[in-house]
Amino acid sequence: MNAPPGSGDAAASALEAASQAEASEVEASEAEAASAVEAASAVGAGGAVQPAVAASVADRARAAELARELDEHAYRYYVLDSPTVSDAEYDRLMRELTALEEHHPELRTPDSPTQKVAGSYSTLFTPVEHLERLLSLDNVFDDDEFHLWAARAARETEVDGWLCELKIDGLAVDLVYEEGRLVRAATRGDGRTGEDITPNIRTLASVPTRLRGASVPELLEVRGEVFFPTEKFAELNASLVAGGGKPFANPRNAAAGSLRQKDPRVTATRPLDMIVHGLGAQRGFDAASQSAAYARFAEFGLPVSTHFEVLASVGDVLAFIHRWGRARHDVEHEIDGVVVKVDAFALQRRLGSTSKAPRWAVAFKYPPEEVTTKLRDIRVNVGRTGRVTPFGELEPVLVAGSTVGLATLHNVDEVGRKGVLIGDTVVLRKAGDVIPEIVGPVVDLRDGTERAFVMPTHCPECGTELVRPEGEVDIRCPNTDACPAQLRELIFHLASRNALDIDGLGYETAIALLEADRVGDIGDIFHLTPESFEGLRGFGQKKIDQILRGVEAARHRPLWRLLVGLSIRHVGPTAARALARELRSLDAIAAAPAEQLAAVEGVGPKIASAVVDWFADARHRDIVARIAAGGASLADAGAAEGPRPLDGVAVVITGTLDGWSRDSATEAVQGRGGKVTGSVSKKTAFVVVGADPGAAKYDKARSLGVPVLDEAGFAVLLERGADAARERAVAADAPAAPAAPDTSGGQGAPDVDSARRAQRAQRAQDDAPPG
């Protein structure tokens, strides 16, 4: 049997606005080899290859240079656990070399990085031979490349099931069990030889030292990925820096470094975990497919992922890939793509492998969320509450679809914990819509010119001496009355999409109004007139009308949005919605004692104290009075009425709803007394599922037996209430066990209900591979 391979090798609003310029062009560093890479974009995915031509001297030199670079980067990644380039840069170099070799086959040698399983084994541990070789995976990077790969596989054999699983970004490990007893654990190494880490693996709570059950195989070699939980990563680095140690660049390096400790007792202190996803040598183990093997692994007590499915069509596979691309941060470990495998072992054997990778599996790589770049400087930004936030000025770099030149460092303590110096090469992370963040330095690239950041002692905007309130991590400017930065940020925040969403009142408008003394605080916004803009450059009648219409609309926004716009410390959308839902008017909130506010679900003592303190300030009460005098509503409609139809009903919304934005759907629920939460729990009354729902939320609803509503059911919930909605909900009869593989080797691990399949059926018809 062929061995299946492993699955994977705020700040302030001004900073956010400046740091996320959308980029449509390719970076200059990548454009250098664009023509060669484009010609080979189908390599590894079944694409046609251009006719070979003789290699020039420059081509030969470039190929040799690329081979040397790739070998060095692989050594630093797999052996030293200390990479100096990002995964994205490594992939780019590999694709360039692959392209050159496809154009000029004479450049391809047996020892080329394109022909080898990446990695080597360290000399720090005893080398051991794997019973069966661990192969790498070919990569595809978009739908077209995946279609080409799938079509090639389907031409060679009739594929009746594609197993899709998350590609864990961790350290590949090989486990050997004899008569059910763990006898050896080794790293991947070069695929043939790894390093013996058995004592260290035994410290992982998730890895059984003896397999469960009476019918364990005589011999079982399994492959998997050891990972470091993302939520624990920052905590580890902080402790390392505090002790004078070297921080890890990312969770993958933390996993590798923790597992390769000479003293297993150190490994035992790290919260490592593992997922098994592959089969090597075996005797006495019977399974017809990958999914059936996973079911057996689970019976033996081996850790297997619940986040996989066996799907019938390429359309369904791509839907899985893109769904998890949106939900990649909903799992406990980092993922950088999805691995797709032909499920049946017989078909895997028929398709075979190259010297490097199986033909029956491929990794669909997501756009990189981590890259390396130079930290040019560290500066500070003053926010609307006076918080002074360090941020990094970077050499602009493309990450997650945006060109990023600025990134948050949160606070001065965080700069110290991360161990970053001005001039460092740093790892930059941008996850989805999250503000770009500097993860840590690449210490091995330091040349001695780097320097430490020194926090300023006075506000860079108004010159006031900065303070650090007792018990807080943030340093603040106490000049809340006159600091121009704070006033600017307060106005910009009030008008932002998360608050009153005032069309036309952006950052530049806020600056212009303040500098011309047309406004002095946020209360003045509701008293703007056409005369307020007289003499201001760039404000024509059309622009003025747009802003004034935006202010008029803001006067009638829901109460929670006004609460957010007031910039009360700690009061974000969640707490604001809870307070508005419970008390219904700003007067009631202002008059409520801290104990009453703290009793509101989702508020608590810290937020309650901040609200009481804010309204205790006479200047703030004057601002509220001026807002009211400007015609703004300080109460929600129906504030004097009794109970509402969805009082106490918790709803989770996932996917896209026709005719509803996420904000409008949320406000529809909250306006009827319900609340919308971000995660599914036993307290959730309904999960509303639109098109392309988040996999984790949907599966959690099924496992807990929470009623699921489609869009029509959501309409019933809003119009007729919870009881009527339950009658048309899709719900499990009883809470389901955690999703487990299908032992039949068929199409269902885990099951996908018929309504969800029907939504995708039409899309899948045009996507099915030939044959």
Swiss-Prot record:
One of its GO terms (biological process) is DNA repair. Keywords: DNA damage, DNA repair, DNA replication, Ligase, Magnesium, Manganese, Metal-binding, NAD, Zinc. Residues 641-731 form the BRCT domain. SMART domains: BRCT, HhH1, LIGANc. Zn(2+) binds at C459, C462, C477, C483. SUPFAM superfamilies: BRCT domain (SSF52113), DNA ligase/mRNA capping enzyme, catalytic domain (SSF56091), Nucleic acid-binding proteins (SSF50249), RuvA domain 2-like (SSF47781). Its cofactor is Mg(2+); Mn(2+). It holds the Pfam family HHH_5. NAD(+) binds at D87, A88, E89, Y90, D91, S136, L137, E165, R188, E225, K341, K365. One of its GO terms (molecular function) is metal ion binding. Residues 1-34, 728-771 are annotated as: Disordered. The active site is at K167 (n6-amp-lysine intermediate). The keyword Ribosomal protein does not apply. One of its GO terms (cellular component) is cytosol. Residues 1-23, 731-742 have a biased composition (Low complexity). The keyword Magnesium applies. Its EC number is 6.5.1.2. It catalyses: NAD(+) + (deoxyribonucleotide)n-3'-hydroxyl + 5'-phospho-(deoxyribonucleotide)m = (deoxyribonucleotide)n+m + AMP + beta-nicotinamide D-nucleotide. Belongs to the NAD-dependent DNA ligase family. LigA subfamily. HAMAP family: DNA_ligase_A. DNA ligase that catalyzes the formation of phosphodiester linkages between 5'-phosphoryl and 3'-hydroxyl groups in double-stranded DNA using NAD as a coenzyme and as the energy source for the reaction. It is essential for DNA replication and repair of damaged DNA. PANTHER family: CHROMOSOME TRANSMISSION FIDELITY FACTOR 18, DNA LIGASE. This is DNA ligase. The gene is ligA.
